[in-house]
Amino acid sequence: MGLGKKLSVAVAASFMSLTISLPGVQAAENPQLKENLTNFVPKHSLVQSELPSVSDKAIKQYLKQNGKVFKGNPSERLKLIDQTTDDLGYKHFRYVPVVNGVPVKDSQVIIHVDKSNNVYAINGELNNDVSAKTANSKKLSANQALDHAYKAIGKSPEAVSNGTVANKNKAELKAAATKDGKYRLAYDVTIRYIEPEPANWEVTVDAETGKILKKQNKVEHAATTGTGTTLKGKTVSLNISSESGKYVLRDLSKPTGTQIITYDLQNREYNLPGTLVSSTTNQFTTSSQRAAVDAHYNLGKVYDYFYQKFNRNSYDNKGGKIVSSVHYGSRYNNAAWIGDQMIYGDGDGSFFSPLSGSMDVTAHEMTHGVTQETANLNYENQPGALNESFSDVFGYFNDTEDWDIGEDITVSQPALRSLSNPTKYGQPDNFKNYKNLPNTDAGDYGGVHTNSGIPNKAAYNTITKIGVNKAEQIYYRALTVYLTPSSTFKDAKAALIQSARDLYGSQDAASVEAAWNAVGL
């Protein structure tokens, strides 16, 4: 972020900047250290010992022992928010920095412990300077902050709706960074609704003055414009269920019990999720059902991909229902992940055909859900471009016939984007050509759909060097284990190198590093 201390501690020298190697610790390997890293902290500065137990308490005691390295006792400023064990047996503790009990917005610290109970890597944003820069006090209540947020987006609670579901609003007090590099107590307000149009607003409200520090509609989509063909007319097998004398697009076949459910909005932009798609027989063959068939079939395949490859149970890894709504709006040129489900427009026929007709677009949107529940990459600037890129990359992993994204739904051009040749569709493929676009809706929040071409090309370089099977494991591990909300391109490079080293060793880690070097990073 540049507003706090960017922290990266690891045995791997490839973790860029502020890198610390822990003595006596090995992950897959223990490479030679590079002494020219910026702000390098020598390994003898750390007290290293095997943790007596792998627990929050033991880790905080370890951090306390290393107080000089972290400029104080970081254990007093960290709150545990998640703990996972990966397939290698490594444990990962995800913390949020706090100030007087208030979490710091968009900051996380992840502490990684190997199978021998040694801390082998630490990365994230510690934000040592937050306390000194918090320059206000809390005067507003959460409800008052919600009122300010509604005014900022030009809506009222009465004017929006989630259909039959209660409004999904929340206001959480946090320490938020301002443009001048300081921090203020602010409410992180989330407002989600589906009527009169889908929205997933995040509004930052100053807790003292009510001033809007930031607002963003975080409805994430594959593209704002595009083209496509008509649905193919191909016959596919569907997992459905029989309910009340009819057949419906509800997939109950998954071994985990996760449901995949497909609805029809009948060209409305309200009453989400819509009407459950049904038939009097077990055949869904009418022209109005074709978009739903594609959405249902594709999502079943995408679920199977994440479950079979990574043992991931739905986007949230908790078996959450996977919901799609097709025929959203009239001639709507978009597909979107809106925080808890997907929507698909029918396209205008000249730029897009129905957007559910593309396997890689469906996988792209589902990956936004996975990202939301793991790294939660901010949807702006470099983190936002990474958010889009990881969705594109997993879109490719689900449809490896070509390097294009969206080729099955575009009408007036061959595809939306290309991993192998980003410049073909107006994206940069090297960091020297990074587009510094404004962080506004009109500027695509810093060019998240434009600058994603750079990490996309790095992914292409990686895949062509080490193959799909290794690359997809490396990318999934980086996304779910190492990345944090404010991760930059360099952080992604470091996370992918470390993931390659964890899984496959130094040779493949070097291939990943070379892939990113080739795009100017």
Curated annotation (Swiss-Prot):
Superkingdom of origin: Bacteria
Protein residues bound to Ca(2+) 2: 360, 399, 402, 404, 407
GO terms assigned for molecular function: metal ion binding; metalloendopeptidase activity
Binding, Ca(2+) 1: 283
Propeptide span(s): 28-221
Enzyme Commission code: 3.4.24.28
Location(s), subcellular: Secreted
Activity as a function of temperature: Thermolabile.
Binding site residues for Zn(2+): 364, 368, 388
A Pfam family assignment: PepSY
Gene Ontology biological process terms, A to Z: proteolysis
GO cellular component, one term: extracellular region
UniProt signal peptide: 1-27
Broad class of the protein's primary localization: secreted
Binding positions for Ca(2+) 4 per the UniProt entry: 411
Residues given in the record as Ca(2+) 3 binding sites: 399, 402, 407
Cofactor: record remark: Binds 4 Ca(2+) ions per subunit.
Names of required cofactors: Ca(2+); Zn(2+)
Entry function: Extracellular zinc metalloprotease.
Family: Belongs to the peptidase M4 family.
Protein name per Swiss-Prot or TrEMBL: Bacillolysin
